[in-house]
Each structure stands twice: as structure tokens, then as C-alpha cells.
Amino acid sequence: MCLNIFRTFKSYFGCNITFVPKESALVGIGGCIGSVARYQINEWIPSLLGTFIVNVLGCIAIGFLMYESIYFGAFSRNSRLFLGAGLIGSFTTFSAFATQTIEAGLFYGIIFIAANILCGLMGVFIGRQIILRGRRSWNI
């Protein structure tokens, strides 16, 4: 089954993308649980400490899940989709960032860290500027 949006994407970019309902549902359900868990932790422990705790817990969880899967095959693909891409992915995106940084090695890892921090800060600044300038021009 291929949705129209994916057909358009395929014809424009030449990519073969298909919609897989079961796998998408696993990621979506896990994502729902992870985002609610993150919200609750940040309600209980507001400020940077809550975010720090969420990120560290997410890194521990993704490290356990992925490396347990790689070395011991302990989790099925569906479990990795539900837990990794869904639950942990929505709980924190920092866990994926940390895993990819370690796997990149020292040189590329440093570049990856610097680029993510710089681009992340620039993205927040640009988004903020769009809103601030838009509000002024829209008289909101």
C-alpha cells in the first residue's frame, strides 16, 4: 500500500517509500507513551534538571536496547521500533544523538556535536525571530 504523498515523494526524489501500517502503529503507540512520560517527568521536576534526567535516562535506555539487540539479538525488530523509535525516541531525541556520536568515532563525533549544537541554537534563534517579526507585522 502506498499513500499519495509517498507516490509524490517517490516520483519527485526517486525514492522508494512505502507506508507500513503495523510498523507505523508500533512507533506511534510507543511515541505516545514516551511523550507523556517526558511531560510527566518535566511536571514533577521542572527546569533543566527534568530535561537532564530525561536525556540521561533516554541515553541509558537506548544504549541498553540497541546494544542488547546488536550483540545478543534480545529484541525483535518490532520491539526496537516500539521501544527505540517510538517510546525512547519521543521521550528524548538526545539518546539517538548520543548513540550516533559515539558510533561516529572521535573526529566525526566532535564535528557532529559541534554541528548539532550550533545548528540547534541557530534553529531556535531563527524560529524565534520568525515569530517575533511575524507578530510585529501581524499586529498580534
Swiss-Prot record:
Regulation: Na(+) is not transported, but it plays an essential structural role and its presence is essential for fluoride channel function.
Subcellular location field: Cell membrane
TM spans (from-to): 45-65, 82-102, 106-126
GO CC, one annotated term: plasma membrane
Reaction catalyzed: fluoride(in) = fluoride(out)
Residues annotated for Na(+) binding in this entry: 89, 92
Major localisation: membrane
Membrane protein topology class: Multi-pass membrane protein
An example molecular function term from Gene Ontology annotations: fluoride channel activity
Gene Ontology biological-process entries: cellular detoxification of fluoride
InterPro entries xref list: FluC (IPR003691)
Keywords linked to the UniProt accession: Cell membrane, Ion channel, Ion transport, Membrane, Metal-binding, Sodium, Transmembrane, Transmembrane helix, Transport
Purpose: Fluoride-specific ion channel. Important for reducing fluoride concentration in the cell, thus reducing its toxicity.
HAMAP family: FluC (MF_00454)
Family membership: Belongs to the fluoride channel Fluc/FEX (TC 1.A.43) family.
Protein name (database record): Fluoride-specific ion channel FluC 1
UniProt source species: Methanospirillum hungatei JF-1 (strain ATCC 27890 / DSM 864 / NBRC 100397 / JF-1)
